[in-house]
């Protein structure tokens, strides 16, 4: 059975794992109501997407 000859250092381990990090969440402002929203998704506040109302706005 294969066994490592030397212990893996923190630097080598962290350099290998740098590609496993989760991407940062991108947030844009809605052009209709200026609320924060994710790109390519319907705005949760006003229900608009690409200049058209796709979903009825939720009343608070």
UniProtKB/Swiss-Prot annotation:
Keyword Ribonucleoprotein among record annotations: yes
GO cellular component: large ribosomal subunit
UniProt source species: Gemmatimonas aurantiaca (strain DSM 14586 / JCM 11422 / NBRC 100505 / T-27)
Signal sequence coordinates: none
One Gene Ontology term from the biological process aspect of the record: translation
Keywords assigned by UniProt, alphabetized: Ribonucleoprotein, Ribosomal protein
Family annotation (InterPro entries): Ribosomal_bL32, Ribosomal_bL32_bact, Ribosomal_zn-bd
Family: Belongs to the bacterial ribosomal protein bL32 family.
Domain of life: Bacteria
Protein's recorded name: Large ribosomal subunit protein bL32
Gene Ontology molecular functions: structural constituent of ribosome
């Amino acid at each position: 059975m294969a066994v490592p000859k030397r212990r893996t250092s923190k630097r080598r381990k962290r350099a290998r794992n740098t590609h496993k990090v989760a991407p940062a969440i991108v947030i844009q402002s809605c052009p209709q109501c200026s609320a924060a929203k994710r790109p390519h998704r319907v705005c949760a506040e006003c229900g608009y997407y690409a200049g058209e109302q796709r979903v009825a706005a939720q009343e608070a």
